[in-house]
Amino acid sequence: MRLSALLALASKATSSPFYRYGMSRPGSIADKRKNPPWSRRRPVVVEPISDEDWHLFCGDMVEILEGKDAGKQGKVVQVVRQRNWVVLEGLNTHYRYIGRTKDHRGTMIASEAPLLHHQVKLVDPVDRKPTEIQWRFTEAGERVRVSTRSGRIIPKPEFPRADGIVPETWTDGPKDTSVEDALERTYVPRLKTLEEDVMEAMGIQETRRFKKVYWY
């Protein structure tokens, strides 16, 4: 694991109470355009689901239950936990124009619209049909998803992150900081100042005598 990933996990992002999550990555140009600092957008009511109960991840094969693409199966390519959204590759699409100017109508592209978590279901790998799941523990203590109909374990898929890295298959390179080195405690707190530490390390003896200073 890279040191930047560890620092990202340690950081805590804070957002405005009027901030509204969307399809764009938080902090991107498109997100800043939709959420300017002066905007006061009405908050969106979202069904609270804990991280322990959430069971849809990028790379999962699911089937759509509602909408124009009901009955079709596709792969989850994006999950927006703050809105309970999932985006399927090539499904539930709508068409829009980009690059529109005064003299050019723009280019029409297909864009996937998000679906709520209750509008899709995981596909059972045994019969390729939608199924309910339960979280259970294996004999080794691993928490897995189990189909309630067939009892088959549905493993979490290995899906690359935004930078193209699959954490489960990543191997550290010569320029990567290992987890052991990043977590190693090398700093020893001391009451001395930086100047006193440098003088002690270099063997510098202070021979000057400072005059008294009075504070009024």
From Swiss-Prot:
The modification Phosphoserine is found at S24. It is found in: Mitochondrion. The keyword Ligase does not apply. GO terms for cellular component: mitochondrial inner membrane; mitochondrial large ribosomal subunit; mitochondrion. Its main location: mitochondrion. SUPFAM superfamilies: Translation proteins SH3-like domain. Keywords: Mitochondrion, Phosphoprotein, Ribonucleoprotein, Ribosomal protein, Transit peptide. GO terms for biological process: mitochondrial translation. Residues 56-89 form the KOW domain. It holds the Pfam family ribosomal_L24. It comes from the Eukaryota. SMART domains: KOW. Residues 1-9 form a transit peptide. InterPro entries: KOW, Rib_uL2_dom2, Ribosomal_uL24, Ribosomal_uL24_CS, Ribosomal_uL24_KOW, Translation_prot_SH3-like_sf. One of its GO terms (molecular function) is RNA binding. PANTHER family: MITOCHONDRIAL RIBOSOMAL PROTEIN L24. Component of the mitochondrial ribosome large subunit (39S) which comprises a 16S rRNA and about 50 distinct proteins. Belongs to the universal ribosomal protein uL24 family. This is Large ribosomal subunit protein uL24m. The lineage of its organism: Eukaryota, Metazoa, Chordata, Craniata, Vertebrata.
